[in-house]
Amino acid sequence: MKKLLYAALLLGATLQFTACENDDSSAKPKQRYDLSQGMVISNEGNWGSNNASISLYYTNGDSLANDVYNKVNKDVLGDVLQSITIADTSAYLMVNASNKIIVTSKYSCKKYASITVAGPRYMVANGKTGYVTAWTNNEVAVVDLTTNKVTGSIKVGTGPEGLIVNGGKLYVANSGGYGKDNTVSVIDVKTNAVVKTISVADCPKAFAVDKNGSIWVVCAGYTDWTTPANSTSGALCKINPSTYEVSKIGIAGFNPDKLQINSAKDKLYYGGSYGAPGIYQMDIAATAAPANPFVSGSFYGFAINPSNGEIMAMVADWKVAANNKMVRYSATGSKIKEYVVGVGPNSGYFFN
């Protein structure tokens, strides 16, 4: 009897030890992909291939993780990730060619909602309301960020792209889509009505607000492939938000479509498009565009680290996956390091 009791106790202890061992040491902790811990890179992927992805660069520790969304959700993201916006604790992923916005947790990248929008490009949040440029329908979709439902739409110009909220107004860049447009729609966010249409240069793309409150918009210019003589040059346009007066600085030789501003809001960075010889830096007080790029190279997009001014330049290659890179430059323009990312990186976003 004592032997049986001893054997039973020994077996129980062995099982308990084994269970504890399995719980504590053999189970590897899951990687937590917190989008607020660095810079999130939107990789478009190849059109029609459903291989859009997210890369996460950790600023503390200088490491990079690729394919973050797929790893967390065990699912493909979709076709062409155009941009990413953070609103409160959620990340909104504009999956352009899939006609949807994927909503994930900011802290884990775990998906919890999907919103149908025709050709979503960019989004800006104003309180509990999201405004999304819907390129396909020439409108801005209005999204309730509490329910993640589309509640309305606002008709604007053709091919709406970047947008920004400033002083109770929403500014929308109408790029022209496959045609030609040179306007910025101004919308009152209280009524969601267009209150002004401003003429700028051809093909406005993206905005920035400087330390003086002026609104800058980069315009790529119009390219007429049939009659090149009808093509127009790019420009940086400065809008006075009080009077809506516009002043222009011409950009010759290429068609810029990306615009960023430093944390002091006194220096603009533009470029990041096909044909651009690099990324340019311009003081907001300048009256003419710089002759030479601040960082030379062929970049599809870029981002500025607000904490140290480093430039994160994106190199895209649609044929060779290993050639898609983020190139990190110091605030003075010196190259620091390269990192392999997903296919078609177009920008980076700092959400911390």
Model-predicted regions and their roles:
Residues 4-6, 21-352:
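Predominantly soluble domains enriched in secretory-pathway, periplasmic, or organellar proteins
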Residues 6-13:
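Sec-dependent N-terminal signal peptides
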Residues 15-19:
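C-terminal motif of bacterial Sec signal peptides marking the signal peptidase cleavage site
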